[in-house]
Regions:
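Cytoplasmic membrane-interface segments at the C-terminal ends of transmembrane helices
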Residues: 2-14, 62-88, 147-161, 214-228
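Active-site micro-motifs of SAM-dependent methyltransferase domains
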Residues: 7, 94, 170
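Secretory targeting signals
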Residues: 12-14, 21-64, 88-157, 192-209, ...
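Hydrophobic transmembrane alpha-helices of multi-pass small-molecule transporters
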Residues: 29, 99, 174-175, 215
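A generic structural signal for secondary-structure junctions
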Residues: 31-32, 70, 79, 114-118, ...
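Transmembrane helix segments
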Residues: 156-189
Length: 228
């Protein structure tokens, strides 16, 4: 896991993507919803703290896994760690840890801004159970999106193919009535874009289920040999 974190910090693109996301949070926190009512401030909490982050980590996860094959570092990595599932496990743990940490940061920031603009009651500080439940949903959805990204990157073994595949599948999911907010790419949208006072439980379970299924598929795909 430390190796994977080092790779992220050493990669200019991945490092800059996270830095840009954090910088974008500043004007959003200052200006977005400055005139919003207390109800809309609470209802926007899940989307503002997790939606952009979830899809950033989905893309980042795909890049982390697929870059091993693009730059052929997988050959050396698998020689050092013959148990290939441990490499995939380290990548998954890394994006989950990153997702949990960044979710905590953004969620805390948006709650703090809501309290400053309105009051503690608006952001449910008087109802810690409800606030904790909302936080848990954000973390789960963000981490599930990140896991899907890693799995897709490991399956496709190419960053461009992984990202184009995610975008293409996501668009197809949104077209179909039965697949909208239920597929591996669009289910986090169904969780995080909804008002905080509501929860599409089917989308949440779909998001977690797809993360588990994608991980299983990636583990099976590890048996494939590397191209010569």
């Amino acid at each position: 896991m430390r190796t994977e974190l080092f790779k992220i910090t050493a990669s200019r693109g991945q490092r800059n993507a996270i830095a840009l996301f954090l910088l974008l949070q500043i004007p959003m926190l200052v200006f977005w919803g400055a005139q919003a009512s207390p109800a809309s401030t609470w209802d926007g909490l899940r989307a503002r703290s997790g939606l952009l982050l979830g899809y950033l980590l989905m893309a980042l996860g795909a890049q982390i896994a697929a870059s091993e094959f693009r730059w052929r570092t997988a050959t050396l990595t698998w020689l050092v760690t013959p148990a290939r599932h441990r490499v995939l496990g380290a990548q998954l743990l890394t994006v989950v840890a990153l997702g949990a940490a960044l979710s905590t940061l953004t969620f805390t920031a948006w709650v703090s801004v809501g309290v400053a603009r309105h009051d503690a009651r608006t952001m449910r500080l008087d109802r810690p159970g409800e606030l904790a439940g909302t936080f848990a949903v954000v973390v789960l959805a963000v981490c599930a999106a990140a896991v899907v990204g890693v799995a897709v990157g490991s399956l496709t073994r190419g960053p461009s193919a992984a990202l184009l595949g995610l975008v293409g599948v996501g668009l197809l999911e949104l077209v179909g009535d039965t697949s909208r907010f239920r597929g591996p790419v669009s289910s986090p949208l169904g969780v995080l874009a909804w008002p905080t006072s509501e929860l599409d439980a089917v989308s949440l379970w779909a998001s977690l289920g797809w993360a588990a299924a994608a991980t299983a598929a990636a583990l099976v795909a590890l048996r494939r040999d590397l191209p010569g």
